[in-house]
């Protein structure tokens, strides 16, 4: 599979909807300019994620005619959580498709299940000092089991601004309610790697939300970093159906491969497990474009 030209052709058209870029507090493999130099001619587009800062300014700063890059923002504490003013400013700055991730490292769910704000497996450096989760105030989007008024108002705002919602590291129950609300508003939604151990959304709920119009993310990093068996990933994709699944890399860690290499490895593994090229094309090219509102 090392020189599978069909896979390479698909990845040249693919959009990786989940790539971690630096500079960031978490050590990252590439800055935007380094990413472009590495990936030009190898991948169609990349949505850039950063747990602490919006990535649209990173994109604007570099000259680039090689890869289509899309901005992203994560609603963690460093950006004020569910911050409407920040989103309005970001949309004024960047008129292109933008991914809005709900809280990740500062979600109540993640902080309850992780000793540290930044998971050690993301860094693999004993000298890196992460804050203890117990010392961090979570970004809450629920009160008494219901979405807060501010969250509902925020959802209406990002729908009006034509932004795509990703569920981040919310609990699966929170993700279910949030994504249903945004779908009902007519918005575009992707469930952020619901197979992740700290989310662990039941496949029944994934199918329920896919039927409503949500996309389901399956990331290479869940296999390469979080050690989720490929058999489980395959089972979940087949259960939901390729028409509702998007493959991503979710890499950018210092020790991880480049996004194009990660997607190549992912595709090679999936081909060995019964998938075909048309299905890979659907999950890497067509579905990401629909998610971002490009088609």
Predicted regions and their residues:
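An N-terminally biased module of ancient metal coordination in phosphate/nucleic-acid-related enzymes
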Residues: 1-68
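Mid-to-C-terminal alpha-helical segments outside catalytic/metal-binding sites
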Residues: 4, 262-295
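Acidic (Asp/Glu)-rich catalytic clusters
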Residues: 8, 40, 58-67, 89-96, ...
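Structural preference for beta-strand elements that scaffold enzyme active sites
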Residues: 13-16, 45, 68-70, 97-101, ...
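Histidine/acidic-residue-rich catalytic or RNA/ligand-binding cores of hydrolases
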Residues: 25-29, 83, 177-180, 200-206, ...
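Extended substrate/RNA-proximal surfaces in nucleic-acid metabolism proteins
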Residues: 67, 80-192
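Active-site glycine- and acidic-residue-rich loops that bind
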Residues: 76-83, 166-170, 193-200, 219-231
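Short acidic/histidine-rich active-site segments
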Residues: 219, 242-259
């Amino acid at each position: 599979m090392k020189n599978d030209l069909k896979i390479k052709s698909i990845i040249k058209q693919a959009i990786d909807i989940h790539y971690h870029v630096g500079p960031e507090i978490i050590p990252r493999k590439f800055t935007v300019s380094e990413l472009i130099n590495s990936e030009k001619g190898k991948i169609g587009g990349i949505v850039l994620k950063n747990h602490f800062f919006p990535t649209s300014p990173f994109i604007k700063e570099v000259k680039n005619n090689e890869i289509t890059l899309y901005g992203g923002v994560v609603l963690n504490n460093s950006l004020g959580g569910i911050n409407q003013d920040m989103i309005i400013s970001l949309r004024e700055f960047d008129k292109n498709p933008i991914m809005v991730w709900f809280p990740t490292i500062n979600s109540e769910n993640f902080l309850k299940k992780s000793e540290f704000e930044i998971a050690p497996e993301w860094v693999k450096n004993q000298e890196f000092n992460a804050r203890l989760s117990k010392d961090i105030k979570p970004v809450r989007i629920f009160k008494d089991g219901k979405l807060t008024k501010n969250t509902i108002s925020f959802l209406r705002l990002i729908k009006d601004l034509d932004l795509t919602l990703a569920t981040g590291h919310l609990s699966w129950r929170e993700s279910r309610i949030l994504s249903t609300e945004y779908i009902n508003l007519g918005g575009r939604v992707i469930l952020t790697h619901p197979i992740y151990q700290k989310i662990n959304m039941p496949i029944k709920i994934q199918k329920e939300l896919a039927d409503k119009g949500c996309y389901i993310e399956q990331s290479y990093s869940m296999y390469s970093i979080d050690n989720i068996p490929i058999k489980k990933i395959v089972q979940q994709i087949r259960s939901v159906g390729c028409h509702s699944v998007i493959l991503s890399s979710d890499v950018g860690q210092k020790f991880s491969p480049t996004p194009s290499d990660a997607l190549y490895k992912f595709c090679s593994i999936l081909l060995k497990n019964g998938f075909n090229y048309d299905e890979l094309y659907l999950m890497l090219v067509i579905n990401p474009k629909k998610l971002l509102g490009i088609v």
